[in-house]
Protein backbone atom coordinates (compact mmCIF):
# COMPACT_ATOMS: atom_id res chain seq x y z
CA UNK A 1 0.00 0.00 0.00
CA UNK A 2 0.97 3.61 -0.18
CA UNK A 3 2.65 5.73 2.35
CA UNK A 4 0.46 7.72 4.63
CA UNK A 5 1.02 11.42 4.38
CA UNK A 6 -0.36 12.04 7.84
CA UNK A 7 2.20 13.31 10.29
CA UNK A 8 2.28 12.17 13.84
CA UNK A 9 1.15 14.76 16.28
CA UNK A 10 4.03 16.33 18.13
CA UNK A 11 6.65 15.73 15.49
CA UNK A 12 8.23 19.04 14.70
CA UNK A 13 10.95 21.46 15.60
CA UNK A 14 9.41 23.26 18.55
CA UNK A 15 7.52 20.46 20.22
CA UNK A 16 8.10 20.38 23.96
CA UNK A 17 10.08 23.61 24.08
CA UNK A 18 9.72 25.22 27.50
CA UNK A 19 8.17 22.16 29.06
CA UNK A 20 10.12 20.49 31.81
CA UNK A 21 9.98 16.76 31.87
CA UNK A 22 9.86 15.46 35.41
CA UNK A 23 11.79 12.29 35.86
CA UNK A 24 10.67 9.79 38.40
CA UNK A 25 13.37 9.37 40.98
CA UNK A 26 13.36 6.71 43.57
CA UNK A 27 13.34 7.64 47.23
CA UNK A 28 16.70 6.96 48.81
CA UNK A 29 17.01 4.67 51.79
CA UNK A 30 18.40 7.47 53.95
CA UNK A 31 15.39 9.62 53.14
CA UNK A 32 13.02 6.76 53.95
CA UNK A 33 14.71 6.18 57.31
CA UNK A 34 14.68 9.89 58.14
CA UNK A 35 10.99 10.18 57.32
CA UNK A 36 10.17 7.05 59.31
CA UNK A 37 11.99 8.42 62.37
CA UNK A 38 10.17 11.75 62.07
CA UNK A 39 6.79 10.02 61.86
CA UNK A 40 7.59 7.84 64.87
CA UNK A 41 8.73 10.88 66.85
CA UNK A 42 5.52 12.78 66.06
CA UNK A 43 3.38 9.76 66.90
CA UNK A 44 5.16 9.32 70.22
CA UNK A 45 4.68 12.98 71.17
CA UNK A 46 1.00 12.89 70.23
CA UNK A 47 0.48 9.71 72.23
CA UNK A 48 1.80 11.42 75.35
CA UNK A 49 -0.22 14.59 74.77
CA UNK A 50 -3.63 13.00 74.21
CA UNK A 51 -4.13 11.53 77.73
CA UNK A 52 -3.08 14.78 79.41
CA UNK A 53 -5.43 16.80 77.23
CA UNK A 54 -8.30 14.43 77.97
CA UNK A 55 -7.59 14.64 81.71
CA UNK A 56 -7.52 18.43 81.63
CA UNK A 57 -10.74 18.59 79.64
CA UNK A 58 -12.59 16.26 81.98
CA UNK A 59 -11.44 17.91 85.24
CA UNK A 60 -12.34 21.53 84.44
CA UNK A 61 -15.91 22.70 84.44
CA UNK A 62 -17.06 24.62 81.35
CA UNK A 63 -18.91 27.25 83.42
CA UNK A 64 -15.80 27.97 85.45
CA UNK A 65 -13.72 28.43 82.31
CA UNK A 66 -16.24 30.85 80.88
CA UNK A 67 -16.23 32.98 84.03
CA UNK A 68 -12.45 33.21 83.99
CA UNK A 69 -12.19 34.33 80.39
CA UNK A 70 -15.00 36.88 80.18
CA UNK A 71 -14.25 40.49 80.94
CA UNK A 72 -16.36 42.24 83.50
CA UNK A 73 -17.93 45.52 82.40
CA UNK A 74 -17.50 47.17 85.80
CA UNK A 75 -13.78 46.48 85.84
CA UNK A 76 -13.46 47.84 82.33
CA UNK A 77 -15.22 51.08 83.28
CA UNK A 78 -13.00 51.50 86.35
CA UNK A 79 -9.89 50.88 84.28
CA UNK A 80 -11.00 53.42 81.67
CA UNK A 81 -11.56 56.04 84.37
CA UNK A 82 -8.16 55.30 85.86
CA UNK A 83 -6.54 55.59 82.42
CA UNK A 84 -8.23 58.93 81.74
CA UNK A 85 -6.96 60.27 85.10
CA UNK A 86 -3.43 59.15 84.30
CA UNK A 87 -3.61 60.76 80.84
CA UNK A 88 -4.83 64.01 82.39
CA UNK A 89 -1.96 63.99 84.91
CA UNK A 90 0.52 63.47 82.09
CA UNK A 91 -1.00 66.40 80.15
CA UNK A 92 -0.78 68.72 83.18
CA UNK A 93 2.83 67.75 83.87
CA UNK A 94 3.70 68.32 80.22
CA UNK A 95 2.08 71.76 80.21
CA UNK A 96 3.89 72.67 83.47
CA UNK A 97 7.18 71.64 81.92
CA UNK A 98 6.48 73.69 78.80
CA UNK A 99 5.51 76.74 80.91
CA UNK A 100 8.64 76.35 83.01
CA UNK A 101 10.83 76.15 79.92
CA UNK A 102 9.13 79.20 78.44
CA UNK A 103 9.76 81.18 81.66
CA UNK A 104 13.41 80.14 81.68
CA UNK A 105 13.85 81.20 78.06
CA UNK A 106 12.19 84.55 78.80
CA UNK A 107 14.49 85.10 81.78
CA UNK A 108 17.58 84.24 79.76
CA UNK A 109 16.70 86.32 76.72
CA UNK A 110 15.29 89.26 78.66
CA UNK A 111 12.07 89.59 76.75
CA UNK A 112 8.81 87.71 76.72
CA UNK A 113 7.71 85.58 73.85
Swiss-Prot record:
Q: Where in the cell is it found?
A: Nucleus
Show the segment(s) annotated as Disordered. 1-35
GO biological processes:
negative regulation of transcription by RNA polymerase II; pheromone-dependent signal transduction involved in conjugation with cellular fusion
**Principal subcellular localization:** nucleus
Q: Which GO terms describe its cellular component?
A: nucleus
Note whether rRNA-binding occurs among the keywords.
no
Claim: Cell membrane is one of the keywords in the record: no
What does the sequence similarity comment in the record state about its family?
Belongs to the ADF1 family.
In UniProt terms, what function does this protein have? Answer: Transcriptional repressor which negatively regulates transcription of FYV5 by binding to the promoter on the sense strand.
One further remark on this entry is:
Encoded by the antisense strand of the FYV5 gene.
Q: What is this protein called?
A: Antisense of depressing factor protein 1
Q: Which gene encodes it?
A: ADF1
